[in-house]
Amino acid sequence: MKKLSIILSLFILISCANKLEDELTIFTSRQPQLLEPILDEFYKDTGIKVNLLSGNAQVLMERISVEGKDSKADIFMTVDAGVLWQAAERNIFSEVDSSILSTNIPDYLRDANNQWFGFSKRARTIVFSDDEYSASDFSTYEDLSDPKWKGRLCLRTSKKVYNRSLIASMIDSYGFEKTKSIVSGWVSNLATEVFSNDTSVLKAVSSGQCGVTIVNTYYLARLLDDPQYDNLRLFWANQKNRGVHVNISGAGIVNTSNNKENAIKLLEYFSSKKAQEFYASAVKEYPVVEGSEINEAIKSWGVFVEDNINVSKLGSLQKEAVFLAQEAGYK
């Protein structure tokens, strides 16, 4: 009887271990409803269940660091290369050896040590009101510092990582002093106080509070179905020089994960053409894998030249970007 009890106990332990091996947990700052459809597809294809824990990126990183080996996180997924770079600096990620990821994800959209990878691209460009302007009025981000735009520019706060990363990319291209001069010009041209998010800025442009702004394109895509925003138009910035600023959403495998094999499978799945098209369509961002179809809502904007800076620099230059914004009076 004792022998049978031991055998049953071992069977239960093995069964529980197998169950855990067939589950993954993602800590993410992305909205769960954006990820759940593709994770359901992953489960159907592989039998691996994925649990989501969502929250603020900084809070999640701190939790992973504090919990250490006790953390349930297998994957950390977030938006902006600057945040992914911070996670790598905090030793949250482990290096991933995957020929699939190395082949599918372009070098400039992933960490040099393969600790994190971009799975969608986010273009940040100019949007204007056609009640006031036409596309021929615009050229570059830098031109928006010209006094001719005084009182007509609206911007999101520099306290959010999106504009910090844009500034970081400009520092990489132009150096600190020239970029500071450009950002100071933006501040001089502001029509109102800075806004807390891109949607509020777009609504301000549409209502005539200002005439032009810089936003991530998916925010505009989300407003396209509402006729009250029909006057908003997109302009691809810097097409004759460095190209449109592009950032990413991405992920890496947490170094304390006990399920790295399945975690790699999920990251590889994210880089598949099927997942790229499914995911990019859901979030209205751009796929990173060449040849993948893009969302119909944004296809009408056409192709654009993008700045192919290695997105790791958006992280390594983040402190300089924050200091520059303070020096330029950009709140």
Please provide the spans of the model-predicted regions.
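Extracytoplasmic ligand-binding site segments that recognize negatively charged/polar headgroups
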Residues: 29, 36, 72-209, 244
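An extracytoplasmic/periplasmic, membrane-proximal ligand-sensing/linker region
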Residues: 285-331
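Short, low-complexity disordered leader/linker segments with a strong preference
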Residues: 1-23
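Periplasmic-binding protein-like
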Residues: 151-159, 269-293
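Short amphipathic alpha-helical coupling segments at ligand-binding clamshell hinges
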Residues: 38, 182, 249, 258-270, ...
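Early extracytoplasmic/lumenal segment of secretory-pathway proteins
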Residues: 16-85, 331
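A bilobed periplasmic-binding-protein/Venus flytrap-type ligand-binding module shared by bacterial periplasmic
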Residues: 125-132, 246-259, 278
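A ligand-binding cleft/hinge motif common to bilobed small-molecule-binding domains
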Residues: 82-86, 206, 211-232
